[in-house]
């Protein structure tokens, strides 16, 4: 008589496909996953508690290290929260630089996701192409702020530095180049029969389930929910740009793939328009005291990061440090649906599903 026994298997915390220190304890019966339990906290640094002893400007470098693949949006959300509290008006040129930095960062983040996700399921070449284009974006951001990954570029009231001479022209040249490469990506991967068999019908959830789990970003839009804060609750100068919000219909790994690939195209549209509208002169930083004291009260802001809805709550008692600071970290919320998606799945689909959710462990652990 053939008999199988359930087995506990640890995926991580040093597994290459987790792209960070993340442990997944799975119970398997043969090749079927019966139960999956995420174990997080390996990268917890107590960012929110540390912030209570820092001045507002000193908090900005810490946000770089949450979602380190999209540090510009993290920079922005803390600055935006403080600016909301003190009622600060941002110079127009600074707003355009912020949008350019954030959208270039969004493209770079999605390129990392595209390359690593495909590498994890067996396609090596796309990884090399993705990092080739990402390197061009990183070089552009390096020229802008002097850093490649943890930028510390934005400030309460604007940005630290103006764009160097010729930088806008380089960004303008990058847009058609990236569009051409993106078409090549689709030719290489998006119609590949082997790839389609790995992602279509895998990791399905409904719009109702996505909302109940507080999912956001492509993980929400893949179910058909048309919700993007850049459109639905415009911040900065996003209401000046014409772009679409990609949505799916089935809510599987394929829809999540399509949404993110189309988001790259829409980000290129925003970058192109921002370059065309870019003010020829003007300040990049409002007049702000060196030591910022937010008035007593509280504020909550939220913006659209590559991984979803990132929020920042600040409670102030009138001092130069926040009384309480809280981040809504989208990767943490998006991770919560993983046990449901994995239950009953073949173990071969584990990495496809995990990669499709697209978490960053620095953001999960905070």
UniProtKB/Swiss-Prot annotation:
Reaction(s) this enzyme catalyzes, per UniProt: a quinone + NADH + 5 H(+)(in) = a quinol + NAD(+) + 4 H(+)(out)
Species lineage: Bacteria, Bacillati, Bacillota, Bacilli, Bacillales
Keyword Transferase recorded: no
Domain of life: Bacteria
Role description: NDH-1 shuttles electrons from NADH, via FMN and iron-sulfur (Fe-S) centers, to quinones in the respiratory chain. The immediate electron acceptor for the enzyme in this species is believed to be a menaquinone. Couples the redox reaction to proton translocation (for every two electrons transferred, four hydrogen ions are translocated across the cytoplasmic membrane), and thus conserves the redox energy in a proton gradient.
Recorded topology in the membrane: Peripheral membrane protein
Compartment annotation: Cell membrane
EC number: 7.1.1.-
Gene Ontology CC: one annotated term: plasma membrane
Protein name per Swiss-Prot or TrEMBL: NADH-quinone oxidoreductase subunit D
GO function term, MF aspect, one: quinone binding
Origin species: Bacillus thuringiensis (strain Al Hakam)
Gene3D superfamilies: Cytochrome-c3 Hydrogenase, chain B
InterPro entries: NADH_Q_OxRdtase_suD (IPR001135), NDH1_su_D/H (IPR022885), NiFe-Hase_large (IPR029014)
HAMAP family linked: NDH1_NuoD (MF_01358)
């Amino acid at each position: 008589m053939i008999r199988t026994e359930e087995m506990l298997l640890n995926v991580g915390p040093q597994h290459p496909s987790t792209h960070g220190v993340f442990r997944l304890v799975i119970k398997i019966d043969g090749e079927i996953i019966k139960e999956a339990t995420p174990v997080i906290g390996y990268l917890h640094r107590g960012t929110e508690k540390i912030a209570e002893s820092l001045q507002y400007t000193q908090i900005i470098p810490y946000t770089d290290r949450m979602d380190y693949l999209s540090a510009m949006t993290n920079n922005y959300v803390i600055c935006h929260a403080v600016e909301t509290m003190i009622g600060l008006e941002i110079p127009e040129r600074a707003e355009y630089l912020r949008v350019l930095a954030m959208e270039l960062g969004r493209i770079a983040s999605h390129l990392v996701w595209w390359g690593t996700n495909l590498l994890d399921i067996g396609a090596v070449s796309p990884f090399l192409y993705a990092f080739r284009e990402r390197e061009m974006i990183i070089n552009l951001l390096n020229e802008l702020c002097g850093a490649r990954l943890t930028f510390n570029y934005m400030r309460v009231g604007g940005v630290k530095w103006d764009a160097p001479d010729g930088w806008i022209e380089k960004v303008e040249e990058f847009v058609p180049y990236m569009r051409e490469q993106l078409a090549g990506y689709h030719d290489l991967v998006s119609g590949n029969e082997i790839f389609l068999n790995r992602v279509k019908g895998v990791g399905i959830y409904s719009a109702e389930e996505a909302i109940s789990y507080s999912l956001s970003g492509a993980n929400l839009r893949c179910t058909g929910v048309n919700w993007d804060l850049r459109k639905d609750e415009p911040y900065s100068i996003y209401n000046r740009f014409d772009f679409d919000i990609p949505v799916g219909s089935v809510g599987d790994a394929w829809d999540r793939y399509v949404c993110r690939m189309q988001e790259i195209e829409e980000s290129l549209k925003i970058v192109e328009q921002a370059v065309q509208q870019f003010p020829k002169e003007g300040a990049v930083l409002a007049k702000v005291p060196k030591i910022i004291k937010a008035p007593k009260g509280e504020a909550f802001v939220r913006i659209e990061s590559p991984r979803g809805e990132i929020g920042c709550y600040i409670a102030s008692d009138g001092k130069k440090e926040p009384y309480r600071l809280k981040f809504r970290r989208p990767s943490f919320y998006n991770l919560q649906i993983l046990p449901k998606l994995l239950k009953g799945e073949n173990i071969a689909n584990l990495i496809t599903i995990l990669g499709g959710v697209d978490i960053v462990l620095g953001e999960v652990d905070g």
